[in-house]
């Protein structure tokens, strides 16, 4: 190409990276028309080949030339040589926003192209001096430099000088052959520049605030600024500390003046100011100060200390790791650092520290909108925050005893961790490379528009994926994506290559987190690579303790045992244990979880293929860890039936079995064990245990809901009792030597069993009824029924097997414990017609058919139960008072010794009994007229009461919430502890409360939160019960609830007495005798 005749061909333009060839030719023609020499045009074309967006760089360059010629500026002075031209074009290709600024601010062109003052080489002190001089302050004043210019002039000068230096930094970054290699330098320069800007803004604030000379003011940088790893465009996290400069300043004046200074410096940095044409620098975020944005803007040092001693949450100490004095009084800044460092380096010993920080990180991930999850360079999985989190956790855990780790910058800290033997050299190098790559991507995305962003370019339908699943990529579409193409050129990559590198980096960061934090917790024989480091005993103990293990020495022994040897189980454990330790650490009791994991391996590791299954199914392994570390009952159950682990890999296998499927199993047992009561009883009880296990696993895994688990357990009880009754009938037919049964027998479910609300530790409340067959006499039928019931009870709860009993509770039968276990239909008819009391009518609201003779059950329910439980006449005042008195006596007498009233989930104030008795009372009052109320379940009836406007929506919500929470808490308590006798009692210790809370959707170690929430719900429920059940006014109900809560800890508990449904029949019997 001749320099005198510059006429680029299409191929020349394409080689330079230009896409709109017609527009490019027109722009070059315009330059020639503006008397730009052909030689300079040729140099421009060559420079465009190095620009990230050549088309935009050319367009902006032409606009700048036109603007300079219009203002009669000497172009050769601003762009004196080819190097300056290349620097300028490279900046224009990486930042459209800077290019548009340059049209009107030639000093930015000069700063980017030649940087005559070499500002890109400034150290921290030189940048500070430059910006202080710009506002007319003395840079030699170390503590209180004061601006001499008025607000508008000073703010304009500060912002202009800041942007001149920013343009030089962008140019230094953009022309680098390897931008990742200089990324730490760029971030440090940006941080130094921000420090200087804040010093200048504080000098302006001193000038503008009366009395500022009496206030020592320091600015503490947090986050990226504090760690000297600032972005181009980012919120700047700050904390302000003030102290009096002389003894005469009172505290109120100090805070008032300090607040004005802080407000003014923020205004200078982030707000529009009258008379200032320069745009603001960046937003200041004070959310990391004590009490966040609700706290005071400025505080004295002692106030900060008091907050961190008494109120700060775990994540706030993690945030303090990056704190650094960035401007203001240096002595006060050092005093702040001296005060906070002990808090930082002892934070890992705080309760649940690492767990809370992990949950905070997880919460941030979960809050990312779904379409952006795989575009988030900073906050997404495998993003910058994952690298920072890994490094910070290692620092905080081991920095307590190793002072060499006490640094704030991510890459410096990673290097120190490698030198200290906490991270292998290879891991440190890989993580450093990944971090720099992602930071450069983030920087390039921000520079383009000089706006805050950390999103990877939008790839349309290919924006989703890259970690667990592949992206749906069309290479042609990627090549047409201008934003992606521009970012890819910054790394010298094709668009599809950048997408692959981004996804590879994210996957590696996630993998490195496991390898760096958890794999060194395995012994040296379990390391997978030669470069892996081995922790000292003390460091290993610190790391186990940090993730929640109460006995780190035992945990180390378990891990050593699990990974020792050359067997298949040991090999698989060496692969999956890092992830297992992480997941166990997320549970309430990691020690229990790891012990159960070891028991499984010892019991089944050599014979079962479950470990291979877990290696291949991440979701199943994670679910298993959640279960083992949160459920003693299920941990023990899995150690008896390891095949259940396979259910965790498929939600379909975890679904509750249908009644038909249960009947198939019970039918098979009937055929197989028809002549052996011991084997049949064992099979039925084992079936119950197995189904509790299935439903418990499903409930813990979130596959089925609370209500579905209750219905599923009810189906299990129905199927087992029906099969057991069938076995007993067949056996007694053979024993009696008859061909057909002398009597039909039915099981009427009562109580929560009747309401289809069976929990994992429930008894089965029932009434047993028989009716003689047409050709049988009463005596034979009665004898037959008694023998059948005897067999039935032996199967379910007799000493015939070591499997846990299924308690068949018959205390709700006529005459209670004093009545016969099984009663004839005629006797039931006579009893209920003549002697039934109000409480028995209420109990019949739950009656339903469960097993046996369906026609007999139907006759009982329709002819005997319905007229009593669905009366057509109103309850009398005497009947109403009888129900209320009975409930009051039950509350007073049935509560176990030593249990406070508000802590019993069933009988306590606002517990299950309050909800159920309230609903049942309203059923007795209205079900005679409203057929929809003729249901057995509590929540079903409550829904109808609300729909029929018999109860307000607000009251229904309170009752429903209390019943649901208390029911789930009972189930959770049983699975957590494995103790049925404690399932109704809310524990006092926070640790056990945390174990129960997990089942209600809380994270681990949230026992206090759960207790507060549950007791608040129960108090509100009790208030509703006081009004709707006891008939008190709102004021009386609130007063009674408050009095109960305040007196609960002082009120002595009475000795346990018999259940009221046992006492009540006894009273009835005495009344009948008196009548006779």
Curated annotation (Swiss-Prot):
Residues 1042-1056 have a biased composition (Low complexity). The keyword Isomerase does not apply. Residues 1042-1076 are annotated as: Disordered. The keyword Nucleotidyltransferase applies. GO terms for biological process: regulation of glutamine family amino acid metabolic process. Disulfide bonds: none annotated. Its cofactor is Mg(2+). InterPro entries: GlnE, GlnE_rpt_dom, NT_sf, PII_UdlTrfase/GS_AdlTrfase. It catalyses: [glutamine synthetase]-O(4)-(5'-adenylyl)-L-tyrosine + phosphate = [glutamine synthetase]-L-tyrosine + ADP; [glutamine synthetase]-L-tyrosine + ATP = [glutamine synthetase]-O(4)-(5'-adenylyl)-L-tyrosine + diphosphate. One of its GO terms (molecular function) is magnesium ion binding. CDD domains: NT_GlnE_GlnD_like (cd05401). One of its GO terms (cellular component) is cytosol. Residues 524-1076 are annotated as: Adenylyl transferase. Residues 1-521 are annotated as: Adenylyl removase. It comes from the Bacteria. Keywords: ATP-binding, Magnesium, Multifunctional enzyme, Nucleotide-binding, Nucleotidyltransferase, Transferase. Its EC number is 2.7.7.89, 2.7.7.42. Involved in the regulation of glutamine synthetase GlnA, a key enzyme in the process to assimilate ammonia. When cellular nitrogen levels are high, the C-terminal adenylyl transferase (AT) inactivates GlnA by covalent transfer of an adenylyl group from ATP to specific tyrosine residue of GlnA, thus reducing its activity. Conversely, when nitrogen levels are low, the N-terminal adenylyl removase (AR) activates GlnA by removing the adenylyl group by phosphorolysis, increasing its activity. Belongs to the GlnE family. This is Bifunctional glutamine synthetase adenylyltransferase/adenylyl-removing enzyme. It comes from Bifidobacterium longum (strain NCC 2705). The gene is glnE.
